């Protein structure tokens, strides 16, 4: 409860909420980013999602990521998830142009 879920084409790309009075954000990353981020202070494999083999990271405490880094990772998450949509859905959403 109390979480905000952001989707593209019906697919989740980020989840925001609070944990111990700190903002918490969960987002999908590439395999390489997952390996780089998963052990950094303030970051961890996302509960539930990562345990199912998915490459999701949770930013849950300081120091974590800077605001700019967090925005970049959430943008990348949107891109990763939107690429997984059907071409028809991507065209519908204006993510790619019809050929």
Where are these regions (language model features)?
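Charge-dense, helix-prone N-terminal extensions
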Residues: 1-99
